[in-house]
């Protein structure tokens, strides 16, 4: 069997552009958030997406206990917020850097996100170092901004919606 080494895999994955998201939760275990690009649609019946979370991450116990989350897809210009949630900054400072609403699940919903998916975690599958969180979508909130944000080749890139 041919096994691909970790660096080759990471280099190859940098060729796959992905939306930049801040994943948030709030509940009995507290409030937490992190930046993620490992997010994708699973099915539209019922509306479900998945989020991958490293079990070694400091936020893992909070998400594991709360069992709710909000996927906040960032707009162009929100790179500093992505960096803040992707680092070692204390949670209270992360959340103080933006305006939030409370979603139907009680999770923080970023007011200026391109789109927010408010979810309950319906299933968890462990693979290697990560848990794959299957998330049943309970509510969606869209913002009118025409600019998206993607992570490609280890850097941010702005996308603009085509004119109709």
Curated annotation (Swiss-Prot):
Say which domain of life the source belongs to. Answer: Bacteria
MF-aspect GO terms? FMN binding; FMN reductase (NADH) activity; FMN reductase [NAD(P)H] activity; riboflavin reductase (NADPH) activity
Supply the induction statement.
Up-regulated by the nitrogen regulatory protein C (NtrC also called GlnG) and repressed by RutR.
Keywords, A to Z? Flavoprotein, FMN, NAD, Oxidoreductase
Residues passing through the membrane, by range: none
The protein's matches in InterPro entries, at most eight in alphabetical order, are given as: Flavin_Rdtase-like_dom, NADH-dep_flavin_reductase, RutF, Split_barrel_FMN-bd
* BP term (GO), one: uracil catabolic process
E.C. numbers: 1.5.1.42
A family per Pfam: Flavin_Reduct
Instruction: Indicate the enzyme's highest-level EC class.
Output: oxidoreductase
Please name the Gene3D superfamilies in this protein's record: Electron Transport, Fmn-binding Protein, Chain A
Q: Which residues form a coiled coil?
A: none
SMART domains assigned to the protein according to its UniProt record, in alphabetical order: Flavin_Reduct
Which reactions does this protein catalyse?
FMNH2 + NAD(+) = FMN + NADH + 2 H(+)
Family in the record: Belongs to the non-flavoprotein flavin reductase family. RutF subfamily.
What role does this protein play?
A: Catalyzes the reduction of FMN to FMNH2 which is used to reduce pyrimidine by RutA via the Rut pathway.
Name used for this protein in its record = FMN reductase (NADH) RutF
């Amino acid at each position: 069997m041919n096994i691909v080494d970790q660096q080759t895999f990471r280099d190859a994955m940098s060729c796959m552009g992905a939306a930049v998201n801040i994943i948030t939760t709030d509940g009995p275990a507290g409030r937490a958030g992190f930046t993620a690009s490992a997010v994708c649609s699973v099915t539209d019946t019922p509306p479900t997406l998945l989020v991958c979370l490293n079990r070694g991450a400091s936020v893992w116990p909070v998400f594991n206990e709360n069992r709710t989350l909000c996927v906040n897809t960032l707009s162009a210009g929100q790179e500093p917020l992505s960096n803040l949630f992707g680092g070692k900054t204390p949670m209270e400072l992360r959340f103080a850097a933006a305006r939030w609403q409370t979603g139907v699940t009680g999770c923080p919903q970023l007011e200026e996100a391109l789109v927010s998916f408010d979810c309950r975690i319906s299933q968890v599958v462990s693979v290697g170092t990560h848990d794959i969180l299957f998330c049943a979508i309970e509510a969606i909130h869209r913002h009118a901004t025409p600019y998206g944000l993607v992570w490609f080749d280890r850097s941010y890139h702005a996308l603009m919606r085509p004119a109709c």
